[in-house]
Design a protein with these regions (language model features):
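Aromatic-anchored transmembrane helix interface
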Residues: 61-68, 83-109, 119, 123, ...
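N-terminal signal-anchor transmembrane segment
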Residues: 1-52, 71-77, 414, 446
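Transmembrane alpha-helices of multi-pass inner-membrane enzymes
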Residues: 184-189, 231-234, 389-399, 405-448
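Hydrophobic transmembrane alpha-helices and their immediate junctions
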Residues: 232, 356-398
Length: 448
């Protein structure tokens, strides 16, 4: 019982980091900042235990790159004389995310006396499933939604005006992008379990993949990016394994796990689609493109039609080089002279690449891209066995920027922090020996 309570608390902390909100009974700060404070405390404890102060070179590099983003942003708004400081404080944001990620890894360590990529991914998967369940309860139980709205602040007024589903901090493209990143991580674990011939362990992973795919798309169709990349990875990995083991009679694919879960999930979805108008509308929104394709012969959605009009590019060299200094709508600038965009962001575009170029030019776009790539590199170098997860995470980030400007640094920072933590193995051994009274020579599960 105590163990499960610890796991639930740890899951709650992971959710606080991955899907931050502001609790109304503590409106001073959002949960991301609170997790960053917790991570800072954990870091201080580590340093005190080790009795030395050392900063990994990789951490300095990624903070340097984040600092470059802030400096370019500062140049952009000063040269253009705009008040939009959206990315001027990017260095601070990077520090907060990394500190919070370290706190998450330490929380998992304190609960399980070990921390690894599969553990982190499993926590992310079930936190995303939890968010999907909360979103469904919000839609079907008004009293529950009233309770959630009275407890947390997450811009729910705007979400309700837009008619969008939301969980506990998971909504719109921010939630969808993190669902997508989690899906590609789950797909990697599924391949790993298939190679290990552990079919039982695949069932909860397949279940979480399907739940996040179905309900996650109802929340934000950006989730489809992770669905596509994850399924493509599963497909090619399965082809590779079949080719390598085609004469091995004892080899079993993961098809059985998928069939088992789908035999349960498919009838449930069909039943509610045919009996609940509300669920039908949610399904048609989440998979609008597929419904349009099968009913009209054309794959299209309302958002893709709008997106086509948002690919707007600068018409002068100066904007390409240093941007216009606007990321948000220029109506927020009282000194702006000209016709402002009536709705949406600057130049009426929500496309990530366009917004970055209009804000701080190509140099800024390259700098923030370098942050994402290097975060993936840190994780891949420190955790080489799982490098495909980080490669797919970075890939998802750049695909998502074709639609919105949301980045996946929170996802990548988790594994970058885990990679940093692997350098403190001796400290982890000492901590476990102190807490469990084990001999220091006894082996300790460590991140791979």
């Amino acid at each position: 019982m105590v163990k499960w309570l610890k796991i639930l608390i740890t899951g709650f902390l992971v959710s606080c980091f991955y899907f931050p909100v502001i609790y109304k009974f503590f409106p001073v700060s959002n949960t991301k900042n609170l997790m960053a404070a917790f991570g800072l405390v954990c870091l201080l404890v580590v340093l005190i235990k080790k009795r030395e102060f050392s900063v990994p070179k990789e951490l300095l590099v990624i903070l340097f790159l984040a600092g470059v983003v802030s400096i370019i942003s500062l140049f952009a708004i000063n040269i253009n004389q705009t008040p939009d400081r959206t990315y001027v404080t990017y260095i601070r944001s990077a520090i907060i995310w990394l500190s919070g990620a370290f706190g998450v890894c330490c929380a998992i360590w304190l609960t399980h006396k070990r921390v690894s990529v599969p553990l982190v991914v499993n926590y992310l998967a079930w936190v995303c499933v939890f968010q999907c369940v909360i979103a469904l309860l919000n839609e079907f139980i008004p009293a529950f939604r009233t309770f959630i709205d009275a407890t947390v602040e997450q811009g729910q007024g705007m979400l309700q005006d837009l008619g969008r589903m939301y969980g506990l901090g998971a909504s719109l493209d921010v939630g969808g992008s993190r669902f997508a990143a989690t899906l590609v991580a789950i797909s990697f674990l599924l391949v790993q379990k298939s190679e290990d011939r552990d079919r039982i362990a695949q069932i909860p992973l397949v279940f979480s993949f399907i739940v996040i795919t179905v309900i996650g798309n109802m929340i934000a169709r950006t989730t489809l990016v992770g669905v596509g990349v994850g399924l493509a990875y599963l497909f090619f990995a399965e082809l590779r394994m079949i080719g390598l083991r085609k004469f091995d009679k004892d080899y079993h694919t993961s098809l059985g796990a998928w069939l088992l879960v789908l035999l349960f999930a498919a009838p449930v979805c069909v039943f509610f689609y045919n009996t609940s108008l509300q669920f039908q509308e949610m399904m048609r929104f989440g998979f609008e493109g597929f419904f349009n394709y099968f009913e009209q012969g054309e794959w299209s959605t309302g958002s893709t039609s709008t997106l086509e009009t948002m690919y707007v590019w600068p018409d002068n060299l100066k904007t390409w080089l240093i941007g216009d200094g606007y990321f948000e709508n220029q109506r927020n600038d009282p000194n702006y002279i000209g016709v402002a965009t009536r709705r949406g962001f600057y130049m009426g575009t929500d496309v990530g690449y366009c917004r970055y170029i209009f804000y701080f030019g190509i140099p800024g776009l390259l700098a923030i891209s370098a942050v994402m790539i290097y975060a993936g590199v840190i994780a891949a170098q420190g955790l080489p066995k799982y490098s495909h997860i980080f490669l797919m995470g970075v890939l998802c980030n750049f695909i998502i920027w074709l639609k919105v400007s949301t980045d996946l640094f929170p996802f990548l920072s988790l594994f970058a922090a885990l990679a940093f933590l692997t350098s403190d193995i001796e400290f982890l051994k000492q901590l476990r020996a102190e807490e469990e009274g084990e001999d220091e020579e006894e082996s300790v599960p460590v991140p791979e």
